[in-house]
């Protein structure tokens, strides 16, 4: 079974979403990120590639750079550029490219599912890249970027997504690369509970993109569990940020939402 949970997302207000949105951290280098964020203090690159706030050539793996990430993450929240929802939700993220729109459910995926092999991998990972993202997760106490999972098509989940996306989206914009980004908040408690039940009937999830981010999030969550003498299993660190797409809708790309992982009790 696939264990998921809703969560209180940390996300930009509508007025700021286009300025905050960025490409994934690993599809561009530091100088490219610096150029894309030029003149935009709200760009998420200041958190996911914080070396852009230092002189060119700064080692992106230095302690000062990781520290800058959390300083910027905190500052974004203090200034209201990222705001945490006041209740737990699932969300729907959709992307339009080349005339095709694909829809994914944004969920908290279970660390234990990854450790047990219920979340399936198809790539080997490098320890140095895992450790880089682990440091980023540790210092921010959050998953700043999601991973992408695929799940076997499910007609009831399809129906829920269709119903929820029949209303105007919370976010709806076209990025400079021409991709459309659309986002809905699932607010109905019965719908949220039913989504959880339906995923519990799915034997496995499959990593579509983000093997290193998945490994890092799961390893840090497992680490926090070992360090917590009062660990129960329902703390936020037991889950990490994932967008789950029906297998028939892949391939995918994404925008940003944050799942906090600092809860201990």
PLM features per residue range, with description:
Residues 115-116, 158-160, 215-217, 251-254:
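Short helix/loop capping segments that flank catalytic or ligand/cofactor-binding pockets
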Residues 184-229, 235-237:
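Active-site beta-strand/loop microenvironment that shapes enzyme catalytic pockets
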Residues 171-189:
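A short, charged helix-loop
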Residues 110, 151-153, 209, 218, ...:
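Short, structured patches in soluble enzyme cores that scaffold and shape functional sites
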Residues 255-261:
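Conserved small/polar residues in nucleotide/adenosyl-binding loops
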Residues 1-162:
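N-terminal extension/subdomain marker
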Residues 242-254:
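Short, conserved secondary-structure transition motifs
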């Amino acid at each position: 079974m696939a264990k998921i949970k809703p969560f209180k997302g940390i996300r930009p207000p509508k007025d700021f979403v286009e300025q905050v949105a960025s490409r994934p951290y690993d599809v561009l280098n530091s100088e490219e990120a610096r150029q894309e964020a030029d003149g935009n203090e709200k760009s998420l690159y200041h958190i996911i590639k914080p070396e852009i706030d230092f002189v060119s050539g700064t080692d992106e793996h230095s302690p000062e750079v990781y520290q800058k990430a959390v300083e910027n993450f905190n500052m974004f929240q203090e200034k209201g550029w990222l705001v945490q929802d006041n209740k737990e939700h699932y969300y729907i993220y959709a992307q339009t490219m080349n005339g095709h729109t694909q829809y994914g459910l944004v969920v908290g995926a279970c660390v234990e599912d990854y450790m047990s092999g219920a979340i399936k991998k198809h790539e080997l990972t490098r320890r140095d890249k895992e450790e880089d993202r682990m440091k980023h997760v540790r210092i921010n106490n959050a998953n700043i970027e999601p991973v992408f999972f695929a799940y076997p098509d499910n007609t009831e989940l399809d129906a829920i997504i269709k119903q929820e996306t029949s209303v105007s989206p919370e976010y709806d914009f076209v990025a400079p690369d021409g991709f459309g980004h659309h986002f809905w908040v699932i607010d109905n408690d019965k719908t949220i509970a039913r989504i959880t039940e339906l995923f519990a009937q799915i034997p496995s999830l499959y990593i579509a993109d983000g093997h290193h981010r998945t490994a890092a999030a799961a390893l840090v969550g497992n680490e926090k569990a070992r360090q917590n003498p009062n660990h129960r299993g329902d703390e936020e660190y037991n889950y990490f940020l994932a967008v789950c797409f029906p297998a028939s809708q892949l391939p995918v790309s994404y925008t940003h939402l944050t799942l906090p992982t600092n809860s201990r009790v």
